[in-house]
Amino acid sequence: SQGSSAQSPCLAGSFQNQNRQASGIDADPGFYVSLNASPNQSACAPGEYQSSPGQSSCLLSDPGYFSSGTASSSQEVCQPGTYQPTPGQTSCLDTDPGYFAPNSGQSEQTAAPLDEYVPSSKSSSTEPCPDKTITISSAAISIDDCLLDSDGDRIHDGADQDDDGDGINDLQDSCPLGLTDWSSDANSDNDSDGCKDSDEDEDDD
């Protein structure tokens, strides 16, 4: 019988750079071959990777990951303090002040919760506000955003008409920053001056 004289082209995902070969060569990890009968494999571009041999295309890096160079066989994870929301990227983004990324592989930065702040970029944790202070919104960037809240009612003293929460308006309260955790009434504050009779008021009447 006669041998076949027909040549079969290498299929996509394989290549052959030598004559008279019986089969194609699978593309290496980090490379691809998109067309049939290709003499060469092509490297995956930055932002892409390919972990398997014999492939006809590369994969975009996932959100939370990146691929910085050519011919990458794997994607790299964003480290704590960084994030990446977009696929196919060559690097991660540093978190902004007021935000943090506590874990690896984050696709979003996280706003500092109430009563915490983040003063710098590329942060993986937050700082707590001092005792008896609050923030009025998330994503605080400075300890200056921590405002005094003497009575713990989540209204900072600058806007609170009753800083110690005793039921007496500060304008009429003789002890506006006095004891907290009590309310003015006939038994505790006989003269309604905002000073607790048993502990603060030397002139109950």
Where in the sequence are the language-model features?
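Extracellular, cysteine-rich, disulfide-stabilized repeat modules with beta-strand cores
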Residues: 1-4, 15-21, 32-39, 49-55, ...
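Extracellular calcium-associated, cysteine-rich motifs in secreted modular proteins
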Residues: 8, 26, 79, 94-97, ...
